[in-house]
Regions:
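Conserved flavin/dinucleotide-binding core of flavoenzymes
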Residues: 431-444, 448, 454-475, 493, ...
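Central helical "cap/lid" subdomain
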Residues: 515, 580, 584-630, 688-690
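Glycine/tryptophan-enriched, flexible segments
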Residues: 168-324, 328-334, 466-467
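Beta-rich, aromatic/charged-enriched effector core domains that present basic-aromatic interfaces
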Residues: 101-233, 429-432
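A conserved short coil-to-beta-strand element within the FAD-binding core of flavoproteins
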Residues: 558-572
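Glycine-rich active-site loop/strand segments that organize a redox cofactor
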Residues: 510-544, 552, 661
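Active-site-proximal binding-pocket segments
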Residues: 269-463
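Glycine-rich FAD pyrophosphate-binding loop
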Residues: 483-485, 489, 499-522
Length: 765
């Protein structure tokens, strides 16, 4: 590794944190110094930013701070994105105060250029924060391999810099001993401030269109930006949390003043929400300097402060140095040999309960405490450190193997936890499987000699009522249910998501059973699904089961046709054709676009009346015997699809979907007329099966949308369905729209209130 200090004359406190990612030793061009911030989203005590400022000053070059919010990071979702948006606001403000150019790129539809590849061609140097996990380290390596300038990584996360030690020690006490002198030298050091002239402005072209920060400070515009991102919208933001540097600093000052004195006594009580700093999200994203926290906690000088420092300096940094030293930190091969042997010995032990992925995610295990732990992660993005260890040691009992347990534990942590996708997360999940530990005899079923933490034992020492109240809290107090109009795929999925987050939900549907176009009709003469959605075989076969599963535990009122909706300041009133009314906190409508205008009393765009749809006439034929294959294989220019009523070889029902062109031509004809016309189209088949069959025609006036309408803003009404998301006219599109609609509904209601000014997040493993 090249000596960065000798090349660029950086001061020791920065040089020791550097590793050069390529072999280019000279700054030779007049392009900007690019400070690429990925995981250190602050301006105070930021080694990467300080190094960039010094280099720009030394070489008299422009300086540009670049932040990208990518769609490709593991478990990219609305929760993580929203925190990154918060961080961008403060980072922009901080750079402005320092007189530094800052540019934000949010990858999204129509905005996915290879920005860093372009900077690699034009920059004088690239300085980036060192984050030792895939895919971030691969991204840096790739840029370094093509860059025509020096690429420098700088540790901004640890008091003992990763390049200075950077070894994996098998036990925390050995790490403590090995780093004692390194730690002692740095713990109390003040961070040097820079007294520099404002750097030159970069007035050259940028390889992307920067996002105006005002688009993030407006919650309506922020949501619109989020909607363009290809991420998981079902993982909602934590509404009472705020990211960013300012909130992190306020939270730290409050804990330093009021919380650190009682930390040693209170830290293990998960029912005591204020017993820990709850700064791990801010630390993970580098919104606050760990060097600052350690220095100021060290100055307190109490036993409680020492214990707090122990967690940061030993257990946290031990994990970071371990991950830094490993090429593939997620793999089970990183466990000690004794643990691997133990897992091999218990590989065939009986697991009495095996959980599916959804059971894990939604906290549907056989254990009450574990379910509360997972609900805390799912809804609030946090899990108390002391419980997190017990939670993580339960997954081996409900999965088939060591690999499956590691994968599931990491998945649950990284998808939902605001501090997930972190070296501490990996070390924590792996510790639950034996990392950094010793054998415990005698061996037990499944766990072998790996340390066990019984859920029942932990529950016995926890105030379960207090912890349950803490976990089941909601940021928004409902007075009325959220009402979903339509019980098809879109309605069922949006209802499921809202219910999973603890909201009261009611679904209204005009049909006799839930399912909308996708429902399977159970008639005396046969079983069939005649929906015109673009369904795959499995989707057609399992549509009812999928929709009913989504609606499990949710109130559904069928045979209810909503005819009008009236908005009030804090609620919405829905009325059906019989004059019955419902009061709702907010509403999601899944109707076809042209049906919305009469329901909403002409408050939607006039062009929605004529929104373009494919139309289909469908013929349902019910025979006495199963449908012959010769009929299924028949093709005609007027017929879009011929299939069985359900994907069953013994089905006695035939479904014939006519093309849009044919259907539009005969759209206003009577059903009897259409039956006769379609039977004329089928005459060439000449099958006796039709002689004893019954016939019924159904008109799908709004079968599949051709375009997506422009979204409109309404504080308490939002829209879902296969017209509102790509791919249009498909089940996938309907589900995608539902996930965003559920997010949009809660987003608008929560952000109508004042956002908190402080980040509230629990400790790491």
């Amino acid at each position: 590794m090249l000596e960065v200090s000798s090349m660029f004359d950086l001061p020791e406190h920065l040089a020791e944190r550097c590793r050069q990612a390529n072999t280019i030793e000279q700054i030779q061009r007049d392009g900007p110094i690019i400070v690429w911030l990925k995981s250190s989203l602050r301006t105070h005590e930021n080694p990467a930013l300080d190094a960039g400022r010094l280099l720009a000053n030394q070489y008299n070059l422009p300086l540009l701070v670049y932040q990208a919010v990518d769609e490709r990071y593991p478990h990219a979702n609305a929760r993580h994105h929203n925190i990154l948006f918060d961080a961008a606001i403060d980072l922009s403000s901080g750079c402005q105060k320092l007189g530094i150019d800052y540019a934000l790129h949010i990858a999204r539809k129509g905005h996915r250029p290879p920005v860093m590849k372009e900077f690699a061609k034009t920059a004088s140097a690239i300085v980036t924060d060192l984050f030792p996990l895939p895919p971030w380290k691969e991204w840096v390596a790739k840029i370094a391999s093509i860059a025509t300038c020096p690429v420098i990584e700088i540790d901004c996360h640890c008091v003992v810099p990763l390049p200075v030690f950077g070894k994996s020690m098998d036990r925390p006490f050995r790490y403590r001993d090995a780093t004692k002198k390194l730690r002692k030298r740095r713990v109390g050091q003040p961070w040097p401030s820079l007294d520099l002239e404002k750097p030159l402005r970069w007035d050259g072209p940028l390889p992307f269109e920067p996002v105006n920060i005002s688009e993030l400070t407006s919650m309506e515009h922020r949501l619109a930006l989020l909607h363009q991102c290809d991420i998981d919208m079902s993982v909602h933001p934590v509404w009472d949390q705020r990211g960013g540097e300012r909130a992190a600093l306020v939270r730290w000052q409050e804990f330093l003043a009021k919380g650190i004195s009682g930390y040693a006594r209170r830290r293990n009580n998960a029912a005591d929400a204020q017993g820990v700093s709850r700064l791990s999200m801010a630390i993970h994203y580098g919104m606050i300097s760990v060097m600052k926290i350690v220095r100021e906690a060290h100055e307190v000088g109490t036993k409680s402060a020492e214990k707090f420092l122990d967690e940061l300096l030993i257990f946290r940094e031990h994990a970071w140095h371990h991950v830094y030293a490993r090429d593939e930190p997620y793999g089970s091969h990183n466990l000690p040999n004794w643990a691997l042997e133990s897992w091999q010995d218990t590989a065939d032990d009986v697991r009495t309960t095996l959980l599916e992925k959804d059971d894990f995610e939604l906290g549907a295990s056989p254990n009450e405490l574990w379910n509360l732990c997972q609900t805390s992660l799912y809804r609030h993005g946090e899990l108390h450190n002391n419980l997190r260890m017990t939670w993580g040691k339960a997954t081996p009992h409900w999965t088939t193997s060591l690999e499956a347990s590691l994968k599931m534990g990491q998945h649950l942590n990284d998808k939902f936890a605001l501090d997930g996708r972190d070296p501490s997360s990996i070390a924590g999940i792996h510790w639950c499987h034996g990392l950094f530990d010793r054998p415990f005899l005698p061996p037990l079923p499944v766990m072998g000699v790996v340390r066990k933490r019984e859920l029942a034992t932990h529950q016995s020492r926890l105030d379960m009522d207090a912890y349950e109240r803490h976990v089941m809290r909601t940021a928004y107090k409902q007075q009325r249910p959220f009402v979903i109009v339509g019980a098809g795929y879109a309605g069922a999925r949006s209802a499921q998501i809202l219910s999973n987050y603890g909201y009261d939900v009611l679904v209204l549907d005009k049909g006799t059973i839930p399912g909308g176009r996708s429902s399977t009709k159970r008639r005396e003469e046969g079983l069939y699904n005649h929906g015109s959605d673009v369904l795959g075989d499995d989707e057609n076969l399992f549509a009812d089961a999928a929709i009913n599963t989504m609606l499990e535990g949710i109130d559904v009122c069928c045979e209810t046709r909503i005819t009008s909706i009236e908005s009030h300041q804090d609620w919405v009133v829905l009325e059906d054709e019989r004059g019955f009314t419902w009061e709702a906190e907010a509403v999601i409508l899944t109707c076809p676009i042209p049906q919305l205008q009469p329901i909403l009393a002409n408050t939607v765009p006039q062009e929605w009346n004529d929104h373009p749809y494919i139309s289909n006439w469908t013929l349902i034929c019910t025979g006495k015997e199963r449908v012959p294959e010769q009929i299924i294989n028949y093709a005609s220019d007027s017929i879009e699809e011929i299939r069985k009523g359900v994907q069953n070889p013994n089905s006695n029902v035939l479904i014939v979907h006519m093309t849009n062109e044919w259907s539009k031509r005969h759209l206003e004809r009577s059903r009897d007329e259409v039956v006769e016309l379609i039977m004329n189209e089928l005459q060439p088949i000449q099958s006796d099966w039709f002689e004893n069959a019954g016939f019924h025609a159904h008109r799908w006036r709004y079968s599949r949308p051709l375009t997506q309408p422009q979204r409109i803003h309404h504080e308490r009404i939002t829209f879902a369905g296969d017209a509102w998301a790509e791919p249009l006219g498909t089940v996938e599109g309907a589900l995608n729209s539902a996930e965003f609609a559920a997010l949009e509904l809660v987003w608008k209601i929560n952000y109508a209130q004042n956002r908190p000014s402080i980040s509230m997040q629990t400790t790491l493993f």
